[in-house]
Curated annotation (Swiss-Prot):
Disulfide bonds: none
Source organism superkingdom: Bacteria
InterPro entries membership: Ribosomal_bL36, Ribosomal_bL36_sp
Protein source organism: Synechococcus elongatus (strain ATCC 33912 / PCC 7942 / FACHB-805)
Family from the record: Belongs to the bacterial ribosomal protein bL36 family.
GO cellular component: cytoplasm; ribonucleoprotein complex; ribosome
One Pfam assignment: Ribosomal_L36
Keywords, ordered alphabetically: Ribonucleoprotein, Ribosomal protein
HAMAP family: Ribosomal_bL36
Molecular-function GO term, any one: structural constituent of ribosome
Biological processes per GO annotation: translation
Name of the protein this chain belongs to: Large ribosomal subunit protein bL36
Length: 37
């Protein structure tokens, strides 16, 4: 899980979602998981 100020899609499979008021990226590739913070 990468914590970044700016989250963006890295590949086509990445999905930008909002969970508990936090913007997150979920993907089939675990390396692409990101959270805004």
């Amino acid at each position: 899980m990468k914590v970044r100020a700016s989250v963006r899609k890295i590949c086509e499979k990445c999905r930008v979602i909002k969970r508990r008021g936090r913007v997150m990226v979920i993907c089939a590739n675990p390396k692409h998981k990101q959270r805004q913070g």
